[in-house]
Design a protein with these regions (language model features):
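A conditional alpha-helix N-cap/helix-loop micro-motif detector
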Residues: 13, 70, 144, 215-216, ...
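Small/aliphatic-rich secondary-structure junction motif
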Residues: 1-45, 133-178, 199-209, 259-260, ...
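Short, aromatic/basic amphipathic alpha-helical patches
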Residues: 45-56, 103-108, 196-200, 252
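A short acidic, glycine-rich active-site loop
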Residues: 182-192
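Aromatic/hydrophobic pocket-lining residues that form π-stacking "cages" and hydrophobic walls in ligand
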Residues: 20, 53, 77, 151, ...
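Structural beta-alpha unit
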Residues: 38-39, 55-89, 94-99, 202-234, ...
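Gly/Ser-rich helix-loop-strand patches that form or flank binding pockets
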Residues: 78-127, 226-273
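Acidic/polar active-site rim loop that often engages polyanionic ligands
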Residues: 128-132
């Protein structure tokens, strides 16, 4: 198995590849630096970025390889992933986009892939090198083992403290009726369901705390929480959906990515629908 980082020569892509390197180093995987040639990217910049990552990889004893391909980016990437044993594909995204922009990242999240996908949004360039606190927002107790494993991988490789931030959504009427007893009962049930993750973190030597919030809007609450705490990295779970469904129903993750003040990695499991 190996980790693949899509490199396009931009600094955000380089930072995404650095996160891929940290993930690969933690699991003992080699790292492939992949570029599909196109008219928009400078090959000189791509090779310069690859050289930077290769130098960092040598310090971590991670084996690297360069793969330069040509053709339709999506078809070429899917063909490469299908022909190789890849654990996770990392790519970068930008918070500055037009409404109808159909980026490589968006196309990858719409399509079924034979690998896990990690989409990195870079807000602070320096944060990738010094991560002290990592946060994983979830709704109530909805957390898969695969997502927790991805989250824990970054906590372990950085030696960072972690937080699972559980948000319970309620409407205004229910929120007004909630008393201390009801709230404690609700949060205690969530803690019970998440207790096995606390045990896993303890076995892995990862400092983990669980925090709760009861709110009407998950994204508003997460953004408020981020603004009042010192996190350097946020891991969130994404779900694959078509561009049409995103247009018709909206996508809360897009708003979170647009407004988040910290670097964020959105994790799409290969089996997540």
């Amino acid at each position: 198995m190996k980790v693949v980082a899509a490199v396009n020569g931009l600094i955000t892509s380089e930072i995404a590849a650095f996160y891929a390197l940290r993930f690969a180093a933690q699991h003992g995987f080699p790292l492939t630096l992949l570029h599909v040639e196109n008219s928009l990217d400078s090959l000189e910049d791509v090779e310069r970025s690859m050289a930077v990552i290769e130098e960092a990889a040598s310090d971590d004893d991670v084996t690297t390889e360069r793969i330069l391909l040509a053709g339709n980016p999506i078809k070429t990437i899917r063909k490469y992933l299908s022909a190789n044993r890849v654990d996770t594909l990392f790519c970068s995204t930008s918070r500055h986009r037009t409404f109808f922009q159909n980026s490589l990242r968006q196309q990858l999240t719409y399509l079924p892939l034979p690998v896990d996908l990690a989409v990195v949004q870079v807000v602070r360039l320096d944060a990738a090198h010094a991560v002290r606190n990592v946060v994983l927002p979830i709704e109530e107790d909805r957390l898969s083992v695969k997502k927790f494993s991805f989250f824990a991988s970054f906590a372990k490789t950085y030696g960072a403290a972690t937080e699972i931030y559980s948000v319970t959504l309620v409407d205004s009427e229910i929120l007004a009726k909630m008393d201390i007893h009801l709230t404690r009962s609700l949060l205690s049930k969530i803690n019970d369901h998440l207790s096995h993750y606390v045990k896993l973190a303890r076995c892995m030597g990862i400092p983990l705390r669980i925090k709760h919030s009861v709110a009407r809007n998950k994204i508003d609450q997460v953004l408020h929480h981020l603004s009042h705490h010192d996190f350097q990295l946020m891991i969130i779970g994404g779900s694959r959906q078509s561009g049409l469904s995103t247009l018709l129903r909206g996508n809360p993750i897009e708003r979170l990515l647009h407004e988040t003040p910290i670097n964020t990695i959105t994790f799409y499991g290969r089996d997540d629908g």
